[in-house]
Amino acid sequence: TKTTQITFDGEKNKIINGITDWVYEEEFGFVRAFEWNSASDKIAFIRFDETNVPEFSMDVYGKELYQTQTVFKYPKAGEANATVSLHIYDLQENKAKEVKVGKDYNDFYIPRIEWTNDADVLSAQFMNRHQNELDLWMIDASKNKSFIAIDEKDKAYIDVTDNLTFLKDDSFIWTSEKDGYNHIYHYDKKGKLINQITKGNWEVTNYYGFDAKNDKIFYQSVENGSINRDVYAIDLDGTNKTRLTKTNGTNNADFSADFSYFINSFSSATTPPKYTLNSAATGNVVKSIKDNDVLAKKLSDYKISQKEFSTIQVNGNDLNMWMIKPANFDATKEYPLFMFQYSGPGSQQVANRWNASNDYWYQMLVQKGYIIACVDGRGTGLKGAEFKKVTQKELGKYEVEDQIQAAKQLGALSYIDSSRIGIWGWSYGGFMSSNALFKGNDVFKMAIAVAPVTSWRFYDSIYTERYMTTPQENPSGYDDNSPINHVDKLKGDFLLIHGTGDDNVHVQNTMRMVEALIQADKQFEWMLYPDKNHSIYGGNTRLHLYLFLIHISEPTRPY
């Protein structure tokens, strides 16, 4: 074996070749930024020049006498991104060349590269900084020619996915929301539409791949209700659609290389995960791998209260909701209500799936006399592009309005004590719970915010600008929806929690909120977890966190 170095300019916090920078990894979901062609004689790679990206520094307290600092490049909204360029290294020529496509881009992203079956032709996705224009380029490395096969535009934004498969003739399968719902399409190699494969007022939630031998596509969708997920097969021409999973809940498939079988992981709100080997032709179970019956039996010994799924009409929309009531629920009594939500764009919390230990805390609270509820408001996913993208340029406006109104309506129920309604969330959910408590101070009496964004000005460029454009272009969208600017409205109990080692949502968010609360002469409680990241775990940390949350959430606690 022989090792050949093909790039020579790499330098920490300046130049990266072939792997992504922090923000690409976090928001575009990939790290390896190089790809071999099918003949193994060319490597395409992305080069990141992050010289001009501002540095973020984070104290690490550790166990030494002096703390240290972690310093890394982190482009916040509106700040300089890494400059990216596409290169192809030719093993025959022992030379790397920069790829120049036939269009000038200013401040852009290259979120995906993938070779076609033709060893000379590379596909590359180029996207503008606003992320509302996506070009799929076909680049012929031998002829130094390129053309755009697909140019998608959206009034809000376009999601980047891995849903691209090249067939033997280099026609390709692609997913898009262009008809209002996420669906599967088939294009010829020039980018001309052959047909739309899936259609309907429902979303394709996962594309598993293409079985070339049988001309079948396998995918997951919410055709059977937006809280459920099922696995389907469909012919390339859009005929012979077959539901392969038979049980309502969340089904997710992992297919064998030849698409003969798949391992199905199934769970529901009442059933812990079950793993089975299934036939891809029929969906029938071939073998049980793990049934979790022992766990299910053990859980049956506890007084577990089930989630009740329903919808609630709020601000003109039917919103998905679950509710958990005490086992000895008495409709003639009044119970305090504690609401959970996340609410981020395209997310879903009201789903028919097993949430394991994340739900055990709710069971403890229910046993202490709470009712727990969760409502997926506007901006959440799997109900079409319009429902999801209504929050564009106003993150936190419509989502908070929906949580406040839902709480009002639930508070009007005879068995809910409207004077004792609380809300909590983590990350985006903490941003939301803070805003809900401040803006809905006549509805919510307490809120918990864990690792919250408190101003989108503090968060990274790719995620934030996808939904908000830049602070320079949209200052009111950023500032009107920042809880920092509404601290004067605080009336109830407020708890802030953050890990000081959070490289994602920096503790700066909480520090700025704390300072604003102090200057507004508002009392509150807060907890910092030293050196813990966005997930706040390790050692006794997560147990400590939840025991603290239980203490804070005691129904007997005065509001």
Segments predicted by a language model, with ranges:
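Beta-propeller fold detector
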Residues: 3-11, 97-100, 146-151, 194-199, ...
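Predominantly five- to eight-bladed beta-propeller fold
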Residues: 6-34, 42-100, 283-297, 349-359
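Conserved beta-propeller blade repeats
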Residues: 13-42, 70-85, 102-127, 133-138, ...
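Serine-hydrolase catalytic core recognition
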Residues: 31, 54-55, 119, 252-553, ...
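N-terminal targeting or regulatory segments adjacent to alpha/beta-hydrolase or S9 domains
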Residues: 41, 46, 195-197, 208-295
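Structural motif
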Residues: 53-58, 83-85, 131-137, 180-185, ...
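Short loop/turn segments that connect beta-strands within beta-propeller blades
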Residues: 90-94, 140-144, 188-192, 235-239, ...
